[in-house]
């Protein structure tokens, strides 16, 4: 820093970033003259912490997207090349075709999730309507019942009607992503409990499971884009790594509070507390 000040005294304009007490500043130091005489130096410091964090997140997101897009594409290309070159036995053909179809579906899902997140980031205004969380929970449970039965996991819905004023598709995304994870990371013979309630001006959606749980030190990161608690299981479990990030952003879009409680080896409970609809379109 002192060297840069001396350089400014010598007539050189100095611009650099400086980190101090957990904040980041853009500093500009320049020589000030009065006539032909040196009057001093001018030092300007701008707090650019938020911009720096945004840029860091953008770079990380771009790197992660590139990796997540490349992985299924490589698998698709590999299978296609083997088939094209006649290196696949007729009896093995269904396996390779299934691989191409599976990885293609994964790629499409990733792109759709990225588009959803982009729309939420941009704050695009989406038409809202009355949505009953109990109906959403019931529909979600029915859609996931096949996956749950395949893993020997029971899915139950209980509670009472709780209406919110919001975007039905986004609220469905919240419920579906939470419940899908609860099934996906559960244990054989486990259970998923979806609860809906209305109290104290809040419409509550609670998803509780008896799954593998999340270590305490990782709980604050599970809603980050592409973050996976257990990377060794990510390929087997599928998914894009964006589901919980969509939950976080969709909840924020509805001014809903998101809380997570988890004990490794015992399970996880996620609660989304929406403003309860009172008949007014301002109830958000």
Task: For the regions a language model picked out, list residue spans one by one.
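Short flexible loop/turn segments at helix-to-beta-strand junctions
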Residues: 122-131, 135, 165
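PAS-family sensory/regulatory modules and their coupling/dimerization elements
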Residues: 1-46, 50
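Short conserved segment of the HATPase_c
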Residues: 214-228
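Short alpha-helical segment of the dimerization/phosphotransfer core of two-component systems
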Residues: 102-107
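Short conserved segments within the C-terminal catalytic ATPase subdomain
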Residues: 147-157
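Conserved glycine-rich
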Residues: 255-256
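Short acidic helix/loop segment immediately C-terminal to the autophosphorylated histidine
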Residues: 84-91
